[in-house]
From Swiss-Prot:
Summary of subunit composition and partner proteins: Influenza RNA polymerase is composed of three subunits: PB1, PB2 and PA. Interacts (via N-terminus) with PB1 (via C-terminus). Interacts with nucleoprotein NP (via N-terminus). Interacts (via N-terminus) with host MAVS (via N-terminus); this interaction inhibits host innate immune response.
InterPro entries membership: Flu_PB2_2nd, Flu_PB2_6th, Flu_PB2_C, Flu_PB2_CAP-bd, Flu_PB2_middle, Flu_PB2_N, INV_PB2, PB2_helical
Organism: Influenza A virus (strain A/Memphis/2/1978 H3N2)
Functional summary from the UniProt entry: Plays an essential role in transcription initiation and cap-stealing mechanism, in which cellular capped pre-mRNAs are used to generate primers for viral transcription. Recognizes and binds the 7-methylguanosine-containing cap of the target pre-RNA which is subsequently cleaved after 10-13 nucleotides by the viral protein PA. Plays a role in the initiation of the viral genome replication and modulates the activity of the ribonucleoprotein (RNP) complex.
Gene: PB2
Protein name: Polymerase basic protein 2
Alphabetical list of Pfam families matching this protein: Flu_PB2_1st, Flu_PB2_2nd, Flu_PB2_3rd, Flu_PB2_4th, Flu_PB2_5th, Flu_PB2_6th, Flu_PB2_7th
Amino acid sequence: MERIKELRNLMSQSRTREILTKTTVDHMAIIKKYTSGRQEKNPSLRMKWMMAMKYPITADKRITEMVPERNEQGQTLWSKMSDAGSDRVMVSPLAVTWWNRNGPVTSTVHYPKVYKTYFDKVERLKHGTFGPVHFRNQVKIRRRVDINPGHADLSAKEAQDVIMEVVFPNEVGARILTSESQLTITKEKKEELQNCKISPLMVAYMLERELVRKTRFLPVAGGTSSMYIEVLHLTQGTCWEQMYTPGGEVRNDDVDQSLIIAARNIVRRAAVSADPLASLLEMCHSTQIGGTRMVDILRQNPTEEQAVDICKAAMGLRISSSFSFGGFTFKRTSGSSIKREEEVLTGNLQTLKIKVHEGYEEFTMVGKRATAILRKATRRLVQLIVSGRDEQSIAEAIIVAIVFSQEDCMIKAVRGDLNFVNRANQRLNPMHQLLRHFQKDAKVLFQNWGIEHIDNVMGMVGVLPDMTPSTEMSMRGIRVSKMGVDEYSSTERVVVSIDRFLRVRDQRGNVLLSPEEVSETQGTERLTITYSSSMMWEINGPESVLVNTYQWIIRNWETVKIQWSQNPTMLYNKMEFEPFQSLVPKAIRGQYSGFVRTLFQQMRDVLGTFDTTQMIKLLPFAAAPPKQSRMQFSSLTVNVRGSGMRILVRGNSPVFNYNKTTKRLTILGKDAGTLIEDPDESTSGVESAVLRGFLILGKEDRRYGPALSINELSNLAKGEKANVLIGQGDVVLVMKRKRDSSILTDSQTATKRIRMAIN
């Protein structure tokens, strides 16, 4: 205040004003400051005084031929003076106006293509809906957000190669376009931008916007997808928010959202299989999202979510060094600890072995709806400052922090036994046992925690055990703050390892992630997710399992048939039959399996009883561990559509229907593909015609390797011997004839020889 008074005083004296407005600036330091270097020191001032001059713009000499000296109003458009220090002319801003009105018009066809991101944004805003403005305190936390809607997910290097190839194809320099997306984009853009007159540099800038994800660390309350971020300045102020619904979708947000859903489904499914890590990798490699391979998306997409990070870790990619517990992302900001195993007793006198972190540490905790700062010592919570959207969210954060603190009074607050299991029916580790227990009911925990008197601190209030705010008292060490805690800003990625149970550890052995941390939230993906792996057939329910199992058999029929005759056990153990077992009533699975295996054995033994349709129909039932019994079945039950439906052993049923004339198979009324029976099956004759050009030598001889299918025989050299599988599921040894002349007689002798070889 004093300074301002003093200045006001000075200004009121006329001499002061005169000195300030009239004196020349000739102090060397000041001149140096404003004249050294190419960088403009005060651009807005420069612009203002330039525009006050008559001819502030310089232009190429050609302008004098294209623009008249004066406009209709007789104002001069350019000066005959040439610009000092260059051979350009001095031009008035009026010349620009004249040019815009009367200058030549070029083709505009490329503008929407080059400035695609802008045109798209206008469309989104045109179709977006702005709702009412609400005045309320905004809890904003800084998060790393995508500020560039509608981009592909190329790395900076990949994008650079694409841009050089599209915009400067003749420039020297090695450019390697390897990824599918790079090639597609390059081809597409080259076609779009043929004969484009827009300056190459501008095109390059715009392409970069389309190809690369740009992120900024911004204060956000509410939606974080790029479509919301582009209108951040319209939707949230310091004390107000405006509702907004985007118009249209952008691919990158859809990819992020669908990737999270696919990763969660895959991790949940892998966790219950016999070898979770192998299964997870198999699924990631065989899944497509919106037509792009999931593994390609994982390599490029920086989304940080528990399931996505587990998939990345499995692929050997680096991930963020923060760890996850109870759905919150923890980042240690100071301190350190060592781990030690300790046995503790719950309130129910159950013994738990927990890994205790000894030492003082500080963490930030960031969740979807709440954030916190946690300071803890060995098995003691020192301080927790929480902020969240509502009481429920604040309570969730408090429970997670208290469990994480490992305090004794938390463990003593357990009532009843802890026996939570994961999806694979394995017991959860003790920390997750405790977490689940209190997430179900935290009343005792909050009641026993203890309360304390609090000092009045700006922006902080106390919170009572029933989660109501108070200015006098609070749960011990816990306060609620109006300010959020910023997300961890670093984009640093670390090398991690993953074990077969999908637990991800950093190089010091700390567990960063595990399947228990994967959210159970179900959502609907915005892009089509295609899971080719049999493990994911269940995701769309029992019908999908049924159809997919039979389609898989038909697609792989040639190899299935050979395995069926040579190594049935290996065939029955194939993972593709695993999902099907959940459809067969548990009590009878074993009997069905024993029955079908016996039936198949007869097919192998008795000439002429081989039946393609029946074999395909019954094969999935043979996969369960068989129980030997004398039971015969005329139909087998599967649980679909909420009840048991029957598959007839001989003949068609609504579940499995094969039309001999059209060769089409329908499963539950849905077309499942074409099924080609072996040529002579209906007459149960011999495939002699197919064996023309081959001499049948006798029974199968294992020394000549696994049986070939009829189709594979054509690859044999003359005189070469091989085992071959003929129509009835029998295997015989054949030799390719050395001469073609005797082919005719083959058909007659084949029939006799096969009978002899088999019997």
